[in-house]
Regions:
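Catalytic Walker B motif of ABC-type/P-loop ATPase nucleotide-binding domains
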Residues: 68-71
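H-loop/switch region of ABC-family ATPase nucleotide-binding domains
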Residues: 103-104
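A short, surface-exposed alpha-helical micro-motif characterized by mixed small hydrophobic
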Residues: 109-111
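ABC ATPase "signature
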Residues: 127-128
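A short, proline-enriched helix->beta-strand linker immediately N-terminal to the Walker B motif
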Residues: 62-66
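Conserved ABC ATPase signature
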Residues: 43-47, 51
Length: 154
């Protein structure tokens, strides 16, 4: 029952005690950052899944969190929408936003991560830098996983 803009300004008004004008200005900036400024007056239920996800990211960024948690941010999206969400997350990475991302998008994780933790059946199998895990892993389960998702041998 709240517009896209209201979904972002409400946390600013209530959690950050920001006045309405400043909250609106910041919300518009965040919508520009996620490429949805033209959707400010629409209701989230009218947006695509990828657009809804980007509104959620803008809302999270509004309160300037130290860490943002993403749990499979692209898993339920149509393939055409995945890239738009990944672009927004990459932009956050470029801005040095700390994030914890649960993902199967391994090439994306390789692109933006400083550290990767590989889990199997909820147990940490290996953790380290991107280079350590993708190039020098001695963990058989991780190597098998990376080989299974690789398109190199098609």
């Amino acid at each position: 029952h709240r517009t896209v803009l209201e979904n972002i300004t409400d946390p600013l008004n209530y959690a950050k005690k920001m006045n309405k004008e400043d909250a609106k200005r910041k919300a518009v900036e965040l919508l520009q950052m996620v490429g949805l400024e033209e959707k400010a007056g629409q209701y989230p239920r009218k947006l695509s899944g990828g657009q809804q996800q980007r509104v959620g990211i803008a809302r999270a960024m509004a309160v300037e969190p130290k860490v943002i948690l993403f749990d499979e941010p692209t898993s339920s999206l149509d393939p055409e929408l995945v890239k738009a969400v990944l672009r927004v997350i990459k932009r956050l990475s470029d801005q040095k936003q700390t994030m914890v991302i649960v993902t199967h998008e391994m090439q994306f994780a390789k692109l933006i991560s400083d550290k990767i933790v590989f889990l199997d059946d909820a147990v940490i199998q290996e953790e380290g830098s991107t280079k350590e895990l993708f190039e020098n892993s001695e963990n058989v389960r991780l190597r098998n996983f990376l080989q299974a998702i690789s398109l190199d041998d098609l």
